[in-house]
């Protein structure tokens, strides 16, 4: 529980959100790839792409972001300086080279949804805010109360992006979803798995892959670990 009110401010002109949001990406898979790349850079081992009736949720078990340590503020600094030092090109673990996505990619979800929940947990500290194409109070973002910060598959650390009422949907065939993701993001292996989860998408038999096709029922036991 927070002992003080957190404030979230996006370092970009609010007018850009409305103009750039729906035009930044026109392909749902490029949007997903941005957040898969963020998960990779956060040393995540698992990314969950969850297709629900009213939203598309992306969760990862990476480091998460701390408000107190300034990591959330850094995330919201869309116009931040690009990495130039070699030591900054590696992830926190030192085992991966960062994907090097541009800061504007953080707004990718606004291409799909007018309202996006961002929730994160790091060292038992939860933070959450709502990105919107039409911010009500200038650069200030609406905070999400601790009691409303919910995760489906992650527990101690990680980040969740929830695109409410998305304008684009995943393909009806899960194999098609897998093929599209592999084209855009091929860096899957034993240490980095993508789980595609849906109640409604059709699951076809496929060979073993680190992009795992799952139904909601088949994943109920995964909350305790993989």
Question: What are the residue ranges of the model-derived segments?
Answer:
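Glycine/threonine-rich ATP-lid/beta-loop region of ATP-binding domains
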Residues: 153-226
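GHKL (Bergerat-fold) ATPase N-terminal catalytic module, capturing the glycine-rich phosphate-binding loop
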Residues: 1-160
């Amino acid at each position: 529980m927070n002992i003080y009110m957190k404030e979230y401010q996006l370092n970009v002109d609010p007018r850009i959100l409305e103009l750039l949001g729906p035009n930044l990406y026109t392909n749902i898979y490029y949007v997903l790839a941005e957040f898969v790349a963020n998960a990779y850079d956060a040393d995540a081992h698992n990314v969950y792409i969850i297709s629900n009736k009213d939203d598309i949720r992306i969760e990862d078990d990476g480091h998460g972001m701390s408000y107190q340590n300034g990591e959330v503020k850094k995330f919201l600094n869309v116009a931040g300086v690009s990495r130039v030092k070699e030591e900054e090109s590696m992830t926190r673990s030192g085992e991966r080279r960062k994907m090097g996505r541009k800061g504007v990619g953080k707004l990718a979800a606004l291409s799909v949804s007018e309202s996006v929940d961002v929730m994160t947990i790091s060292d038992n500290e939860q933070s959450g805010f709502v990105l919107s194409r039409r911010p009500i109070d200038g650069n200030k973002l609406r905070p999400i109360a601790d009691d409303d910060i919910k995760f489906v598959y992650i527990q101690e650390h990680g980040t969740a992006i929830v695109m409410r009422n998305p304008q684009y949907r995943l393909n009806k065939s899960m194999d098609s979803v897998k093929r599209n993701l592999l084209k855009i993001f091929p860096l899957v292996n034993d240490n980095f798995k993508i789980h595609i989860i849906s109640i409604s998408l059709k699951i076809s038999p496929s060979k073993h892959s680190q992009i795992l096709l799952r139904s909601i029922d088949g994943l109920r036991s995964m909350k305790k670990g993989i």
